[in-house]
Amino acid sequence: MGQKRQRDSKSSTFHAKKRKKAENATAPDSDDGWDGIVGADELNWKEVALPDHLEDAGGFFGLEEIEGVDIVRGSGNGEVKFKAVAGKPKKSILKKKAPEDENSEYDEEWSGFSDDDADRPENASSPAVEKPEKSDTKADKKSEKNADKKEAKDAKKKEAKAAKKEQKEKGSAIQHDTSINAGLSFAALQDTEEDDGADVSAWDSLGLSPEILTGLSKMKFASPTSVQEACIPQILEGHDVIGKASTGSGKTLAFGIPILEHYLEKKRDDISAEKEKKSEKDSTPIALILSPTRELAHQLSKHIGELIAQAPGVNARIALLTGGLSVQKQQRLLSGADIVIGTPGRVWEILSTGQGLIRKMQQIKFLVVDEADRLLSEGHFKEVEEILNALDRVEDGEVPGGENQASEEESDPSSERQTLVFSATFHRDLQQKLAGKGKWTGGDVMDKKESMDYLLQKLNFREEKPKFIDMNPISQMADNLKEGIVECGAMEKDLFLYTLLLYHPKHRTLVFTNSISAVRRLTKLLQTLQLPALALHSSMAQKARLRSVERFSSPSSDPSTILVATDVAARGLDIKGINLVIHYHAPRTADTYVHRSGRTARAGASGKSVIICGPDEMVGVVRLAAKVHANMANGKKLPLESLELDRRVVSRVKPRVSLASRITDANIAKEKISAEDNWLRNAAEDLGVEYDSEEFDESNGKGRGRGRGRHQKQKEVGSVSKAELAGLRAELKQLLSQRVNVGVSERYLTAGRVDIDALLRGEGNASFLGPVDPLHF
């Protein structure tokens, strides 16, 4: 065996020193034999961050916590001590002590020459200075090295900034030269002419900044609408504004432009004061815009974002807070946002669970309540009240002597806040249900005093009397809107809906219903009839809702696209090209009818609104006409014109609708039975019992409870076999492949009144074979 090699004495002393250093680093300064057990006072406690809505949490504000420690109980006196968990550095749980400066005698501030220094001999000065120890010189060298590194880094940063500045100046000079040279060629002149926007001289009277005017020019907004012309100057002067205007009149930019003007003014003030750029955490938003629906919130963000993108020098950031999307992402967006747009539920969820967010929101300069009559209606949107209370909350100062001063400082931001309220309807009487046997109150639809009192009770305006701007005191319906009513039997609504759609080919149509189940059934019915139908309701996932709106509003989509929706699409949805609005169910309230019909005839365009009215809805429709058109002059024109559909057309399309209804009802019943069966099977598995579907159906059929007849009918409809469904589909396909014949001989085309040349050219309504008079109203 070989002899074991002896360890070098130098390396052994080196390792011993290393171990000694490590022990000294982990142990406290006072104790050399420290076992890692310390008292509560020696721990590095951290303050607990509480959500804003807890306020002081009933006196528990100021709680502290620590992580990574184990509790050690004393054997005799019961004193509780702590030690670091395994794997955690022991020094990390201790309080950080202020470092004692060993070289303090060298770091004293120089106070100038004294007389003693002048009297002292030269050779006596050198021995007076004692040489520091070796360790001290090492520490000095280390600190000097760190200082040198820091200085070098700072110098590099300054050089990089200077280089960037020079590069920018050179780039701008080059760009200027190229633009001058490009101006000499005619091609460049043609390009500039094509890129020129609209003439915005009509906006000059509003006193807008050049940046905003440039954005409006690029967006082709040549002149302001009436509501914009009336509201923007009042908002820029600092007044609280209540704006009432018909749907599609440009209310979004009426409050969006003043918000961006304030952003630019604030930006100029910061530049003139040469303020340092704040971090995202320190920035506070300037505006909060509340919307009743997610679709309207997305639309507001889109419209204001387009103006921001087109206006040079406007870099305002928008945070969109709506349900159905990631909360974490929205919290990150909110941290650096200038404008916050959202629905009340998600806005309050984020504000109430965050730290310091409510205090930030209390400093906003604009609070905008869009579609205020819906947001502030009784029994809806409880979160709106929570948000308003949080914005107006004033906390008392902790110091008794400084309570007044603290309250004044905290109340200043809310006193500077402008409140802007916009809607097409404000009258509370419009929210009364039209159907039912309760007491019905008619009368003046637009009472300014009642509208003002109603809003003053709900909102904390800065001014005692905010500016009330009413752009349509007589009628809230658009001027170019034509309203009609189609009377039908209770079971014939599907038939008359399909007939109305055939009368209006290549029309983008919006169909409103009062229930989600009706949306689902009608969408499948129209798709079975080979019509491009889309669904939109509140039970859909947010991405599916956005997808439906995008497909419906896309310019490249089929011009005959139909959107079947609940009242979630009734407010604020601005989709270009909607020609027809059909109310499959009569609206429950008058304000709902106003907003539903407002999806068409927007921004000066024409449109039609038609109610399909059954016998049981006639009373509600009569009340609706009395409420909405109460102030019509002398009753010269009927508010809702009765439409008579050609009975030949109705009778010819009836077989199509009957087949499509049978197919749709069978598919829906099968899906419902399958879903119920799966639910019962899973419940039986969870309970550990056997499930027999036939036995369950027999016991369910013997009962006499509520819904027995509906279940029986559903079972009968769902019992249609696949072969029968295939036969029904084939028969329907055969009918849909032919045009609707309205009394024309297919053998002898020239014998009737058919214009063969027009048929060959594809003119007229392609759904019908023969002349059909269009619906004029």
From Swiss-Prot:
Give the residue ranges of motif DEAD box: 370-373
What Pfam families is this protein classified in? DEAD, Helicase_C
| Compositional bias segments (type: Basic residues) | 703-713
Basic and acidic residues: compositionally biased ranges: 1-10, 130-171
Please state where this protein is localized. Answer: Nucleus, Nucleolus
The chain positions of domain Helicase ATP-binding read 232-444
GO BP: any one term: rRNA processing
Q: Which UniProt keywords apply?
A: ATP-binding, Helicase, Hydrolase, Nucleotide-binding, Nucleus, Ribosome biogenesis, RNA-binding, rRNA processing
- Every copy of the Helicase C-terminal domain together lies at 496-646
Q: Where is this region: Disordered?
A: 1-36, 86-177, 393-417, 692-720
Q: Which GO terms describe its molecular function?
A: ATP binding; ATP hydrolysis activity; RNA binding; RNA helicase activity
Q: Which SMART domains match?
A: DEXDc, HELICc
User: What family does this belong to?
Assistant: Belongs to the DEAD box helicase family. DDX24/MAK5 subfamily.
The free-text domain remark for this protein reads: The Q motif is unique to and characteristic of the DEAD box family of RNA helicases and controls ATP binding and hydrolysis.
Q: What is this protein called?
A: ATP-dependent RNA helicase mak5
Lineage in the entry? Eukaryota, Fungi, Dikarya, Ascomycota, Pezizomycotina
In the UniProt record, the gene name given for this protein reads mak5
